[in-house]
Structures are given as structure tokens and as C-alpha cells.
Amino acid sequence: MKRILILIAAVAYLSGCGKIIDWVPVTFQIRVQDALGNDLLDPANDNRWLAGTTIRFRGIVVDLDETGITSPITRDMSVTYEGFRLEKGEDYYFLAFGQFEGATDYDEESFVIYWPDKTYNVITYDRRINTRKGGAKEVWKLDGVKCTSPIIIVR
């Protein structure tokens, strides 16, 4: 009887499931404003200067899509590449790029935004996954200086 109990306990212990984490896909958000804090991406503020903006990631150059997302918002957590686009948030407009796998470490990944006036900004992203704690440590840099997300570019 004792052997059977030990066997049942061993089977229950060894067949237990580990911690399952649904990692949220990463989307890069970039706000653009002037020195006074005015949203330069808002169509009401004449954002025609955006035409011709591109982003380069891993050698691939993607043009800005100013029409926004047309796909429905769902609760699905799968990664869907949605390109480089202009989106409207709660209180402001922003440029979004992605989505990228949330369960992946990123080591100093660089994104270069090329503006129509021939200037550019370099965004660097570093991410370390900690499966034990169920979180990730993210470091964002704008032109080499640490910043927060969403990234705010002053033009």
C-alpha cells in the first residue's frame, strides 16, 4: 500500500504543469511633438510633413502607412506584423511599428526613423525575459539616451 501511495504521489508530482505565461506582443510607439508639447502627428495640426517617412529595421526599409489599422481589435495574443503606421491613441496620435514576439530577448535592436527633411532618429530596444518572475526588463534609448515608452521625439 505504501508503494502505491508513493507511486501515485510521484506521478502527480512529475506530471505537474509549469507556469504558463502569455507574453504580450511588443509594439513600438513613438510620439512626435514640438517644444511646446503640440502633437505634430495630429491631422488637425497639419501633419502633411510626414509624407515620405520611413523606418529601417534589420536592413529592411518600411514606408509609413498613414491610413492606420483596418483589422479588428481582438483578444488574440498572437503576433501579427502590422507595419509602420500612424495610429490614434486616447489623447494623442503616435507612430507604431510591429508587432514583435513578446517572449523573445532583444539585444540592442536598432530602429532608424528617416524623416522627409533628411534627418533621422535611432531608437534602440533591449529586452530581457525573466520567466521565473514572469516579467521582462526593457530598456529604450532615443539617439543613445535612455527614455520611456511611448518614446517622445521633439522636433
Label the model's feature ranges.
Residues 24, 43-52:
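Short coil-to-beta strand junction motifs in C2/discoidin
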Residues 13-16:
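C-terminal motif of bacterial Sec signal peptides marking the signal peptidase cleavage site
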Residues 1-4:
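Positively charged n-region of N-terminal signal peptides that target proteins for export
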Residues 32-46:
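Short amphipathic, basic-aromatic surface patches that mediate peripheral association
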Residues 18-22, 26, 31, 57-155:
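Extracytoplasmic cysteine-anchoring/structural motifs
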